[in-house]
Structure formats: structure tokens, C-alpha cells
Amino acid sequence: MPRAVAGPEIERLIQLIARLPGLGPRSARRVALHLIKKREALMAPLAAAMTDALGKIVECRRCGNVDVCDPCTICTDTSRDRRTLVVVADVGDLWALERAGVLNAPYHVLGGVLSPLDGVGPEDLNLAKLVTRVHEDEVGEVILALGATVDGQTTAHYITDLLREAHVRVTRLAQGVPVGGELDYLDEGTLSAAIRARTQM
């Protein structure tokens, strides 16, 4: 068993950082060491920002986005095209599309994708509220901005069937999204091309 290299507070910091996606123990040690070296310039402001965010961040009951207000900033933006609704798997995908700046519509966050192997079924996703929004808001087009993974495509087909009786145009992202790709990892140019070339489901 490896020995601790620092006091329990530092070891706890390293262990917590290692829980972040994409960071293992070695990367977590490097991040922790950088934070410790930059205590005043980085660690203290980061701790304050995290404490502030913890007390203020809420999930939007309307769309599933995270913000400091409910409904969120996007849902209350009256300049957005309410006849279009963009469906994404998670908030990271919403942020990626907002960075690309090619859509001016509200979003609907599913909270994941259908994945029978992982035990994620329709009841685990924010699908009932999607159908309600499409009807109540008189949506004309639903853009399925889901990853080109098997689970993403399965979810897209499920939603298409779910909305068939709503007589709404259902489109999905086309070129630019590689098979097996996740939206959060794509650059803005690729996302822009995919939005412009979306296809009818």
C-alpha cells in the first residue's frame, strides 16, 4: 500500500480531485500541487466560487438546465424562437451548443440517453415533460441534438416515435458529428456544420 506523502487534508484534497471526470490519481496530485502553490491566486478564489455556487445553483424545472434561477436564463429569454425546441442529453451538450452560437431556441435536457445495458429506460429520462412542452408551447420543430452513439441514436428514434402523434417536425444533427462522438467534445465549427445540415427523422 502506498504511503501518504502529505497530511490528511492534502490527501483528502487529492482524493476529491481524483473523482472528477478524466482525472486519475497522478493528475489529481498535479492539480492539487498547483492549487497549493497558487493558494492566494487560485485556491482561495476557487474555494469561494465553489461555496457560492453550491448555495445558489438550481435545476430549471422547465428544461433541466442548471443555473442560479428557476426558470433558467435561457427559458426566460424572450428573444428565443419558441417554435423550435432543442433536445440534448445533458447540460454539457447544451453548453456546447450555446458556445457554438448557431441556435436561438430553448432547450430540453433529457438527463441522459436510453441505455439498456446500463439500466437506463424511458422512465429514467425527462421524456414526459418533453411531450407536454411540445403540446403546450405549440412547438413546430424538435431538433434532436444527441450524440452519434448507439444509445444516442436509439434515444433519437424513441423520441421520434413518441412525438409522432404530435405532428411536429423532428430533425437530428447530420454531418460533422462523428459516429461514436459526444457533443461536449466537439469544436464550435463542427457543431455549426452539424446544426446547419440537420435532417428529417
Curated annotation (Swiss-Prot):
InterPro entries: DNA_Rcmb_RecR (IPR000093), Rcmb_RecR (IPR023627), Rcmb_RecR_Znf (IPR015967), TOPRIM_dom (IPR006171), TOPRIM_RecR (IPR034137). GO terms for biological process: DNA recombination; DNA repair. The keyword Zinc-finger applies. The keyword Zinc applies. Keywords: DNA damage, DNA recombination, DNA repair, Metal-binding, Zinc, Zinc-finger. It comes from the Bacteria. GO terms for molecular function: DNA binding; zinc ion binding. A zinc finger (C4-type) spans 60-75. Residues 83-178 form the Toprim domain. PANTHER family: RECOMBINATION PROTEIN RECR. NCBIfam families: recR. Belongs to the RecR family. HAMAP family: RecR (MF_00017). May play a role in DNA repair. It seems to be involved in an RecBC-independent recombinational process of DNA repair. It may act with RecF and RecO. This is Recombination protein RecR. It comes from Xanthobacter autotrophicus (strain ATCC BAA-1158 / Py2).
